[in-house]
Amino acid sequence: MLKKENCCLIALASVPLVMTLGNSMLIPILPTIEKKLHISSFQVSMIITIYSIVAILLIPIAGYLSDRWGRKMVMVPSLLIAAIGGAITGWVSWKVENPYIWILMGRAIQGIGAAGAMPVVIPCVGDLYKDEKQVSTGLGIIETSNTFGKVLSPILGSALAAIVWFLPFWAIPVLCVVSIVLLLVLVKAKKQEGEVPPLKEFIQSIISTFREKGRWLIAIFALGAIIMLILFGILFYLSTILESKYDIHGIWKGCVLAIPLLVLSLSSYMAGKKIGDNQNVMKKCIYIGFLMAAASVIIPLFIKGIYLLLLCLVIMGIGIGMALPCLDALITQGIEKEQRGTVTSFYSSMRFIGVAAGPPLYSFFMKGADHEVFYLTSIFAAIGAVIAIIWIKPAKDEKTVKQKPEPTS
């Protein structure tokens, strides 16, 4: 990789890191927020969900605009909006007597910013390199940054909340400003090449792409939703039972939450390095990863204990980590650059649907016994494995599209 490309990748990797911290940092403190605001478990889960719902609706628009205006022109203002949303959430938590509704409004604004930030990074990496092995490696680094944010977030969130419960909200605008500076300094805006196609022609090209590649694209969209639903649902479950069942609080709780996420991060990095441009290997990593996630929660159905549960979640982390960069690589390498931002935005929307659905869905099943949560997880993961095996069919004879190296926009 060239030095210039490395600098761009560092700046781009800061975006998922910051966006993940801004969301996942709240997971370990949700029980604390529930107590401070005197709200239900479902209501507190909506603090995560409202952010994702808004992002889901706006991500396709952001993807389209990034194809038309350039990636950087969309990401920087979006990060600024996310910073404003975080600042509003922090301020109302500090100054308003009953801030729950205002917190949801601030989180909704943060979701608007998130729609144009993290999802645009994936097509950005595809634009950056012409060698698809480098694209896979770059996407592995992006997913590693994303998952490292999940590793750091429970520790950082718990540490900040130990000072003042709403301090994690104030960390969001600070982190966004850091990422904005990196993008402005290290990423050069790309000049528009040739004429921009009319909107009608562009939409027709997207429709044509879905007609030609719809089966495997929809499969990857579904897998993206399932994998994030499982991940955020299990994190919500673990965050809750660590306090209610095992009496683990504060930074220690954050450290426990970080264990499976650290393994997930390392697994993502290794998978991104190893898969190269081999789509058959990508498919195997995806369905094996889902099978590992499905199998990991079978043992806790019969044998109880925090250590065994953590071991099983580590196995799940390995599986999810294997699958994530492969999903990114398949969708990025299979789409033309001119349509990449729009098509990958649908994939990102589906991932956010999983993020939005996970906590409230798991909250509902947590009203019963623990085994209901494990059954739910295993069923979703098994469905994901079946989808990957049946509907993802790597092309054997088609030549993969090679991209020209360009500065990222």
Predicted regions and their residues:
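Cytoplasmic helix-loop-helix junction between adjacent transmembrane helices
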Residues: Y100, G106-F148
